[in-house]
Amino acid sequence: MVTPSSIQKELEERLRSGFTSPYVGGLFLVPYHLQLGSWEMLSNLLPDKIGGIPPQKLGLQVIHHSLYGIKGTRELDELRESSYGLLSGLPFICSPVTENRFFNQIPTAHSEEFLLEMGKRQKQLGYLKGNIVNTDSHSIRSFSRMHMPKSYLSKEKIYDKSIRTFWTQDQETKNPIFLKASYSGTTVSMAVPDLMDKTLQILQNPFLSAMDKEHFVGTLLSQLDEKGIRVILPMRNSDKRLKEMEAIDASQFTQRFEGRRLADVFTYLKDYPDPLRFLVLKVREDSETKYVGFITNDVNMTP
């Protein structure tokens, strides 16, 4: 039977006898864990033991697995060297079944509290600058038997069950800020307002959010505007918008951006109450004139 005392005894024996490991570089993560207070936060995430294994150590293994494991769905456990467990204070590697049990017992509220606290500590330590925030979403194919709406999977180019992830990232440091995971069928309009609220709680300062075309929704942009969040995103390509850009008089392309002519005008978006700034680049490629448009609610931003 595995108990905390038996784990500690076996761990001390392994350390006394010495070991070699391809994962020894992971020990350089120890100061980072101490800075962030990873042990304390994992204690609050799931205080109960999982089969006698301290949840803090199991949580550390999951974190390290994201660094050393393979991406995507795995059929076999590719980490078999027992010394890998020593990074998490364990004399062995917990099985995928144990990891899944760990995830299944974590309440969603605890997960969000963990991410909020982690984000706030990163901000305090200077790992997040919080000036420009990348906002994006991805669908990860799910093989769950649960009935759920289907989402479009861009990689596979099919509609299927998926886990919808919505996240924010600090553009300057490339560090993650917050993440939400939802079932298939969850749209950006449903998930992003709360995602922005959590990001604001972490950063504690106004920021500009860079988004993709999926966020081109008037009601969503209106909600973000009410929260005081500045956004910039590419204009959706449509015949209507192309004609609108082509109709801009040449005299309005008075500015330059990376050697390309730029017009700073205004446009309207359905379900958004006010005019939006419309930044239009005029590009000459392959003897053709092309237009690239961006919209923003930031009236003070310098193109």
Question: What kind of region is each of these model predictions?
Answer:
Residues 1-159, 165-185, 189-197, 201, ...:
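Dynamic "connector" segments at or just before major functional cores
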Residues 131, 207-209, 231:
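Generic beta-sheet signal
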Residues 136, 179-181, 210-212, 232-234, ...:
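Generic beta-strand/beta-sheet core signal
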Residues 153-155, 197, 219-221, 280-282:
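Generic recognition of flexible, low-complexity loop/linker segments
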Residues 186, 214-215, 300:
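Short, surface-exposed acidic/glycine-rich loop or hinge patches that mediate macromolecular interfaces
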Residues 203-205:
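Short helix-loop-beta connector
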Residues 209-218, 237-240:
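Acidic, metal-coordinating catalytic cores used for nucleic-acid/nucleotide bond scission
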Residues 222, 227-303:
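An anionic, glycine-rich sequence signature occurring as long contiguous blocks
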